[in-house]
């Protein structure tokens, strides 16, 4: 396999399913590719002296893929290499703190952040504020999104385990100025079986709103109903709830982006939500798993973001508010 054009070192912050999936996909396709996953301190013993982890990725009807992935501890002072290409794949509510923890290593003059979080529209606003405070004035924020379904199983002593539950697509937003560079980066991801493509920034913005709609519907409802995406459609009140949530997102999104009226129409958002469900029928959603593990959820960055923007615009969002408060009630018991 020919090497991709983009060969700059990549650092990945976020050792959950998507971050490890990205790292494993690239390293299994290109075993010597210069990347590293940054882990928090409590993973130090697992990483050990070898500074590598082993990841096993299982996919439907395919042989498992194994990869050795370089690993670093975020606050390890011996890791002094400058970070120029950062993939941020943490939980949305962890993103800002994660970036702040590595500010001394960020290249202030030439920093590219690939934002691959749920709730990235919300995260983007907060991230730009915090980077400005640290005098990183002109970072490239590359908005990314993926519909791949991936779940992380409990690790054993020797390796991490991932299961790909649905084959999706990955998109990366690019401007006229950086289209060629992002196209080369997307080629790397595509050759690593991530089904990746660089698209114009305006198209990416619409796609992020469509992904937000899918997350605002599927995440809280699968968590509340305790079921997979596929089983969700069999619940009697699913269609009515879905339509109300989507209508509110459409109202807010089109008010904020009048040039995207067609892409953010209720029918367009509904079609996208249904596509995501079909691509990930067996996926239980990250919010379902967070509730199951009694962990904090991303509800504030998803439905909460829609509610806050609606309040600013004078648009009521009762369906999103109902889901938001139901999830909050569940997590308040933890």
Across the structure, where does each feature detected by a protein language model lie?
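Helix-loop-beta segment of a Rossmann-like dinucleotide-binding subdomain
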Residues: 107, 159-171, 223-234, 284-293
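Rossmann-like NAD(P)(H) cofactor-binding subdomain of soluble oxidoreductases
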Residues: 62-161
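A structural signal for isolated positions on well-ordered beta-strands in alpha/beta enzyme cores
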Residues: 11, 34-36, 112-114, 142, ...
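Rossmann-fold dinucleotide-binding core
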Residues: 120-211
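NAD(P)-dependent Rossmann-like dehydrogenase/reductase catalytic/cofactor-binding core
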Residues: 2, 6-7, 240-334
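NAD(P)+-binding Rossmann beta1-loop-alpha1 motif at the extreme N-terminus of oxidoreductases
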Residues: 2-72, 85
């Amino acid at each position: 396999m020919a090497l991709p054009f983009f060969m700059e070192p990549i650092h990945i912050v976020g050792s959950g399913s998507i971050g490890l999936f990205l790292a494993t996909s690239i390293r299994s396709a290109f075993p010597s590719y210069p990347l590293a996953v940054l882990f928090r301190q409590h993973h130090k013993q697992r990483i050990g002296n070898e500074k590598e982890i082993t990841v096993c990725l299982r996919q439907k009807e395919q042989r498992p893929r194994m990869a050795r992935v370089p690993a670093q501890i975020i606050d390890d002072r011996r890791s002094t290499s400058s970070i120029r290409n950062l993939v941020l794949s943490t939980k949305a509510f962890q993103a800002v703190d994660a970036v702040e923890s590595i500010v001394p290593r960020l290249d202030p003059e030439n920093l590219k952040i690939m934002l691959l979080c749920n709730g990235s529209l919300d995260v983007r606003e907060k991230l730009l504020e915090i980077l400005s405070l640290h005098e990183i004035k002109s970072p490239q924020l590359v908005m990314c999104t993926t519909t791949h379904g991936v779940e992380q199983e409990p690790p054993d002593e020797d390796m991490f385990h991932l299961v790909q539950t649905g084959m999706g697509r990955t998109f990366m937003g690019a401007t006229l100025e950086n289209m060629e560079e992002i196209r080369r980066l997307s080629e790397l991801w595509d050759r690593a079986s991530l089904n990746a493509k660089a698209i114009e920034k305006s198209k990416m913005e619409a796609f992020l709103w469509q992904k937000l709609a899918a997350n605002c519907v599927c995440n809280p409802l699968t968590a509340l109903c305790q079921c997979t995406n596929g089983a969700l459609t069999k619940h009697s009140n699913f269609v009515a709830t879905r339509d109300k949530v989507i209508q509110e997102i459409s109202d807010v999104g089109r008010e904020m982006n009048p040039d995207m009226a067609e892409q953010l129409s209720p029918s367009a958002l509904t079609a996208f939500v249904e596509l995501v469900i079909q691509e990930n029928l067996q996926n239980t959603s990250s919010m379902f798993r967070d509730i199951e593990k009694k962990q904090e959820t991303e509800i504030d960055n998803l439905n909460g973001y829609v509610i806050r923007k609606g309040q600013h615009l004078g648009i009521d969002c009762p369906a999103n508010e109902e889901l938001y408060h139901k999830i909050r009630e569940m997590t308040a018991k933890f």
